[in-house]
Amino acid sequence: MVDESNAGPVAPAVVADAEVKAPTGKKRSSSRPQKAPPEPAQPKMPAAKRRGYSEQERSEKLRLIETKVSEGNTLKDAIKSAGISEQTYYHWKGAAKSAAREDIERTRPLSAGDEFAELVQLEEENQRLRKQLAEKLRTENTELRKRLGLD
């Protein structure tokens, strides 16, 4: 069975006064599918609250760790048994060391030259304070005289 409608040669179609438009600009692609709305965030577990230790608690834990290490435990095990992290241990140890160094510097005896310089400084401060007190007493005295009508 032959289809007779397609059997002959095809004549070109001529369209008069038709303008051929050249493509201009970018071709638009088909619209993209919309993004799915973000899933609601799962409620996060609250982070563990930081525990603040007092100076006394810190020094007790450091002493506890030192005694456990001297008994033969490893440093890591001693720190774990104290309930703090290694980082916290080293931070506390450094702070305690610097505080001890400051105490030593404060209690160090002064040399003769330092003692003399400190004495001169104290005498200057004493003179300044005496002048300040005298001026304050003078102004207070004049105000009292005015109130009493003695001036």
From Swiss-Prot:
Which GO molecular-function terms appear in the entry?
A: DNA binding; transposase activity
Positions with biased composition (Basic and acidic residues): 52-65
Q: Which UniProt keywords apply?
A: Nodulation, Plasmid, Repressor, Transcription, Transcription regulation
Q: Where is this region: Disordered?
A: 1-65
Per the record, the GO terms for biological process are: DNA transposition
The UniProt regions of compositional bias labelled Low complexity, in chain numbering, are 7-23
Q: What Pfam families does the database record attribute to this sequence? A: HTH_Tnp_1
| Entry superkingdom | Bacteria
UniProt keyword Transcription present: yes
Family from the record: Belongs to the SyrB family.
Q: How is this protein named in the record?
A: Probable transcriptional regulator syrB3
Organism equals Rhizobium meliloti (strain 1021) (Ensifer meliloti)
